């Protein structure tokens, strides 16, 4: 088994009406927790790392872990560069073996976003690396980047069509009302906008900010063409909450093998639920 491009996973999802979950990773324990569930449920998976993750653990180390787990669990894995902002950073990581990258130029005007994404696409496609880009801008917090409500804006369907045609991007993250992080109230998802984007854009669509979104809303986006669902915050909250509770009950505890396993098990329940919501279970052979 090996580290593969997300395009192979997303093409199957698009053809068969389900979504591939993309779970953000932060350390060896989060990788292991995710893959224990995906292996058990035989679900394809995308392991997504932000620039902050690769500062915490070097790419080469994460890549080695993922390669080893791919063999252990007998399943292909996609290791994805989430919310990266420069061609140089992506180029270095692709040369190290990564085959999936998101270039985030959503903070730029349309023309500048196109120029940046096109440069990344031209390089990545020469390396069998798929490219995701974002049009429109989600609010919330991702790594050290915070986008307030005034700076967020939704994806325009016709701009999305032009963007894909001009860049040759493999998948498109759309802004339809979700945000990074948790919600103070139920998000208002613009399903009609998503349907209009799907009518004019052929590439797989990506839903960012899926943590804390009602399951029925996520299922509806998949019915309307979303084939990759990103989950980050819910995983961290489950893990951290379980570890905090363990220490509250075991104030003298100090063995990481105990409290980390508790956190992992809590995280695994979130992973299990998201796989069921995405309809991705039993999509890879045993």
Swiss-Prot record:
The active site is at 82 (proton donor). It catalyses: D-tagatofuranose 1,6-bisphosphate = D-glyceraldehyde 3-phosphate + dihydroxyacetone phosphate. Keywords: Lyase, Metal-binding, Zinc. Signal peptide: none annotated. Zn(2+) binds at residues 83, 180, 208. Pathway: Carbohydrate metabolism; D-tagatose 6-phosphate degradation; D-glyceraldehyde 3-phosphate and glycerone phosphate from D-tagatose 6-phosphate: step 2/2. One of its GO terms (cellular component) is cytosol. Disulfide bonds: none annotated. Dihydroxyacetone phosphate binds at residues 181, 209-211, 230-233. GO terms for molecular function: tagatose-bisphosphate aldolase activity; zinc ion binding. Binds 1 zinc ion per subunit. PANTHER family: D-TAGATOSE-1,6-BISPHOSPHATE ALDOLASE (PTHR30304), D-TAGATOSE-1,6-BISPHOSPHATE ALDOLASE SUBUNIT GATY-RELATED (PTHR30304:SF0). This is D-tagatose-1,6-bisphosphate aldolase subunit KbaY.
């Amino acid at each position: 088994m090996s580290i593969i491009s997300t395009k192979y996973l997303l093409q199957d999802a698009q053809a068969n009406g389900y979504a591939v979950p993309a779970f953000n990773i932060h350390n060896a324990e989060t990788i292991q927790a995710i893959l224990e569930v995906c292996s058990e449920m035989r679900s394809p998976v995308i392991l997504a790392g932000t620039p902050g993750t690769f500062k915490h653990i070097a790419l080469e180390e994460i890549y080695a872990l993922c390669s080893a787990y791919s063999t252990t669990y007998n399943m292909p894995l996609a290791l994805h560069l989430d919310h990266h902002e420069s061609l140089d950073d992506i180029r270095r990581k692709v040369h190290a073996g990564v085959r999936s990258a998101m270039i985030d130029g959503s903070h730029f005007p349309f023309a500048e976003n196109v120029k940046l994404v096109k440069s990344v696409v031209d390089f990545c496609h020469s390396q069998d690396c798929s490219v995701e880009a974002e049009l429109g801008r989600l609010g919330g917090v991702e790594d050290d980047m915070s986008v307030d409500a005034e700076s967020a804006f939704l994806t325009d369907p016709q701009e999305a069509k032009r963007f894909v045609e001009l860049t040759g991007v493999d998948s498109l993250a759309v802004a339809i009302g979700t945000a990074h992080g948790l919600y103070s109230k139920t998000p208002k998802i613009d399903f009609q906008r998503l349907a209009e984007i799907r009518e004019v854009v052929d590439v797989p669509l990506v839903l960012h900010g899926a943590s804390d979104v009602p399951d029925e809303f996520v299922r509806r986006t998949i019915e309307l063409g979303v084939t990759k669902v990103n989950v980050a915050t819910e995983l961290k909250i489950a893990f951290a909450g379980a570890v905090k509770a363990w220490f509250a009950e075991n104030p003298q505890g100090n063995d990481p093998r105990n409290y980390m396993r508790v956190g992992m098990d809590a995280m695994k329940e979130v992973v299990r639920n998201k796989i069921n919501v995405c309809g991705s279970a039993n999509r890879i052979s045993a």
